[in-house]
Amino acid sequence: ISDRFHFPGFQKGKQVYEMLKASDVYIMPSVSEPFGISPLEAMQMGVPSIISKQSGCAEILNHVIKTDFWDIDAMADAIYSIITYPAMHKQLKEEGLKEVNQIVWKKAGKKVIDIYNNLLNK
């Protein structure tokens, strides 16, 4: 599979974005990831993403494909679908970019403040 997949190991700075620019699909099959930022980086670069349902970011991301980390058949199907169906690739790319551009610290902070205010008012 080495002729079709890249396993670059640790990347930093520009290397990350250069690798993402050259990618058709980003996959994060983590068993446990409190909140991986790498799918957001991929989405920011317009790369459709596949993440595990068990990752923390699965709770907030909608325009990704989510699979169980142990279900390699579902993961393979997701990869195949993104590569084979241009409309799916386009939708995940465009909607994912819109979604990730809406994630800003100000909005996240307001949500936390609203939660605390709701709890205090009960």
Predicted stretch roles:
Residues G36-P39, C57:
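Short glycine/serine-rich donor-binding loops of glycosyltransferases
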